[in-house]
C-alpha cells in the first residue's frame, strides 16, 4: 500500500560564508539547499527536493529562512530534525520542523520577506564575517531619505543583477529604514518579493550617497530610469541576512 505524502515546513538559520548561495547547483558546488537535501535523503532513504522562501546569494546569511518539501516517510519529525542537525555542518541549523497543509509552498505561499543589512564604519577582525563596511561615517539622514523613496511599488531593474524573468522587476516595498544597533548601522527592508542582489545594490547606492560620493538625485534617477552606473557594485554579501518570512 502506497504511503501518503506529507508536506513539511522547516525554519532554518545558516552562516552563508563558504556556500555558493541557497539554491542547489549542478556538480560539486556546495550550497545550503544542496547540503540539507543531501542529509535528508540520507536519513529518509528517498529523493528530497526542498523549496526555500528566499534564494539567497553566495555569502548571504539567514536568520529565519523557511523551506518546505514533500515526503512519504512516516518518520516522526522530532527524530528527523534531531538526525538532520547531527549530520548537517555546524553552519546550518534546522530550528523547527512541522507538518503543513498539502498546498503550502515555502516560496509561493509567502506574502513578504524581510532582509537586514549590517554595516560597520570601520573594518573589524571579529564582526566582518557578518557585516559590510563603509570605511567612514556615513550620513544616515541622507540614507534614510533614500530609504523613504523605496516604499511603494517600483521597478527595481536598476538594482538587480539579472535580466527580468516572467515575474518582471516590479516589487512592492512596505518598510525600509536605517537604524543604529550598537556598532552597526542596520538597514531593514520588507517587500513582497526581491530581485537577485537587489538589497545589496540598494545598500551600495545608499552608502555612496551617505559617504558623499553620489548625489541623492542620482540615486532617484536610477530608480526611475531602470539603469545604474557600471561602477556601482553590490555591497558585501557578508552583511546581509534573510531575517523573516511572513505568510
From Swiss-Prot:
Name the catalytic site residues.
57 (nucleophile)
Cited InterPro entries: PsdUridine_synth_cat_dom_sf, PsdUridine_synth_TruA, PsdUridine_synth_TruA_a/b_dom, PsdUridine_synth_TruA_C, TruA/RsuA/RluB/E/F_N
Q: Does the keyword Isomerase apply?
A: yes
List the molecular function annotations (GO) for this entry.
RNA binding; tRNA pseudouridine(38-40) synthase activity
Q: What Enzyme Commission number(s) appear in the record?
A: 5.4.99.12
Q: Which reaction does it catalyse?
A: uridine(38/39/40) in tRNA = pseudouridine(38/39/40) in tRNA
Sites where the protein binds substrate: 115
GO terms for biological process, alphabetical: tRNA pseudouridine synthesis
Matching entries from SUPFAM superfamilies are given as: Pseudouridine synthase
Q: Give the UniProt keywords, A-Z.
A: Isomerase, tRNA processing
What role does this protein play?
Answer: Formation of pseudouridine at positions 38, 39 and 40 in the anticodon stem and loop of transfer RNAs.
Q: Which family does it belong to?
A: Belongs to the tRNA pseudouridine synthase TruA family.
Record note on quaternary structure: Homodimer.
Per its record, how is this protein called by name? tRNA pseudouridine synthase A
